[in-house]
Amino acid sequence: MQAEDLKLILASTSPRRRELLGRFGLPFEVLGVEVEEVPRCGEAAEDYVRRVASDKSARGQSMAPSDAAVLAADTEVVLDGQIFGKPQGAEHAREMLGRLSGRTHEVLSAVSLRRGDCHWQALSVSRVRFRDLGLEEIDAYWASGEPADKAGAYAIQGRGELFVAELQGSFSGVMGLPLLETARLLRHLGLGTARLLAGAAP
């Protein structure tokens, strides 16, 4: 498949995912989608993140041209089996960051790709250890506005990296779109790694 013949759609308005997918140098369009993002009773975090990513790509496919390939992702912070979503306010963010302080949590990023009747998925699992955080730091971070719309109330690509003592896994996965797993999925569209590397060159 020639890249110019491929209509690729990112079913997300996240600036982080748009930036990350853009690193491949492929043309793509952005489509905003809305799906229910509420864990089901007893649903494991890995199953949840896979389901939400799948729902997003399915929703995007229903809105896109029939020949388009639709890519979507979902990222969640998980501690002790509990999914940390986006903070509902300052107190919620303070609670989440306080619980993450000095501990290791997981960041799960599921990627879903659809084209026609085909559906492919991949999952990135990263482990992030926070240093001990002070309340003054947490309050100052919330005041910056950065954590307001971020899972787990922090952005590793921004000021939130100052909290990270150790990362095992994918930096881009923690950001919201794991590039290695995404590249593997794009192979199903005939886009090998060499093509993606060439496309990313200036």
Curated annotation (Swiss-Prot):
<dbReference type="InterPro" id="IPR003697">
    <property type="entry name" value="Maf-like"/>
</dbReference>
<feature type="site" description="Important for substrate specificity">
    <location>
        <position position="16"/>
    </location>
</feature>
<feature type="active site" description="Proton acceptor">
    <location>
        <position position="74"/>
    </location>
</feature>
<dbReference type="GO" id="GO:0005737">
    <property type="term" value="C:cytoplasm"/>
</dbReference>
<comment type="similarity">
    <text>Belongs to the Maf family. YhdE subfamily.</text>
</comment>
<dbReference type="GO" id="GO:0009117">
    <property type="term" value="P:nucleotide metabolic process"/>
</dbReference>
<dbReference type="GO" id="GO:0036221">
    <property type="term" value="F:UTP diphosphatase activity"/>
</dbReference>
<keyword id="KW-0963">Cytoplasm</keyword>
<feature type="site" description="Important for substrate specificity">
    <location>
        <position position="75"/>
    </location>
</feature>
<feature type="site" description="Important for substrate specificity">
    <location>
        <position position="157"/>
    </location>
</feature>
<comment type="function">
    <text>Nucleoside triphosphate pyrophosphatase that hydrolyzes dTTP and UTP. May have a dual role in cell division arrest and in preventing the incorporation of modified nucleotides into cellular nucleic acids.</text>
</comment>
<dbReference type="GO" id="GO:0036218">
    <property type="term" value="F:dTTP diphosphatase activity"/>
</dbReference>
<dbReference type="InterPro" id="IPR029001">
    <property type="entry name" value="ITPase-like_fam"/>
</dbReference>
<keyword id="KW-0546">Nucleotide metabolism</keyword>
<dbReference type="Pfam" id="PF02545">
    <property type="entry name" value="Maf"/>
</dbReference>
<keyword id="KW-0378">Hydrolase</keyword>
<protein>
    <recommendedName>
        <fullName>dTTP/UTP pyrophosphatase</fullName>
        <ecNumber>3.6.1.9</ecNumber>
    </recommendedName>
</protein>
